[in-house]
Each structure stands twice: as structure tokens, then as C-alpha cells.
Amino acid sequence: MKKLNNRELFNIDQELFNFRGIDRAIWTRKAELMAKNGDDLVGGGKSGISKPTENTVMKFATDVTLKNLELFKETVESFKKQLTGEQLDIFYLRWGQANLDWEEIAEKQFVSNATIYRKRAGILETYARMKGVL
């Protein structure tokens, strides 16, 4: 099985930082889509009843950015279910609100730096497998 090199580990590490603000990003994107723009007035010859709810649902269903944000959230949520208790603690210390660096996490977990970096590699490789990178 292929192992991730340091650059790939770093990139996945940075990608997981986006999870902290994913709910806000999804909410913001939905608000942008719901905002009125002039697109609804195109073809103005029809005097039918407008369907704002249907239009909004269609915008949500067809927006690629929103779909990608929701897929990322779903992927990370299912990834978290695969982690052990200790790995989940490390996940929240690193990519949760705590935002600690690896040396600080090693101190909190009472392990050496080498051990925490091995655990980091294991966590990131699990995520890479879920994404299909490995």
C-alpha cells in the first residue's frame, strides 16, 4: 500500500482545517443563492405565478459549490466515525476549536513528538483512504 509523503500529509492537514468553518460556509452559500438577483425576471412575457420556493430549491440542487461543501462535510463526518477515541481527541485538538500545533497536542496527550507524528500520519492516511487518494 502506498504511503503519503510529507507534502501530501501537509496538504491533507491543511484541507481538514476547512472543516472548522464548514457550517458557516454552507450557510453563507445558501444565503447567497437565496438573495434576490435579476435572473428571475428573464422572459418577462409570462404572467404566471412565481414559485420562489421551487426556484430556491432548484438553485440549491444545481449549485456545484454548495454540493462540494456539503460533500466535504459529509466525508469528514463519516471519517470521524471511523476514528478511535484517542484519534478523535487528537482530531478536535488539531482541527477543532482548539487549533493546537502537533507539539502542543503531544504535550496534552503525554506522548513524544515522534509518537504524535506517527498518530498524525495514521489519521491523515485514514482520511486519504476515505477520499480515494490512497
Q: What is each residue range found by the language model?
A:
Residues 26-27, 70, 91, 115-117:
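Short alpha-helical segments used as structural interaction elements across diverse proteins
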Residues 1-80, 133:
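N-terminal interaction/assembly modules
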Residues 98-114:
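Helix-turn-helix DNA-binding module
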Residues 82-100:
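Short amphipathic alpha helix immediately N-terminal
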Residues 116-130:
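DNA major-groove recognition helices of helix-turn-helix
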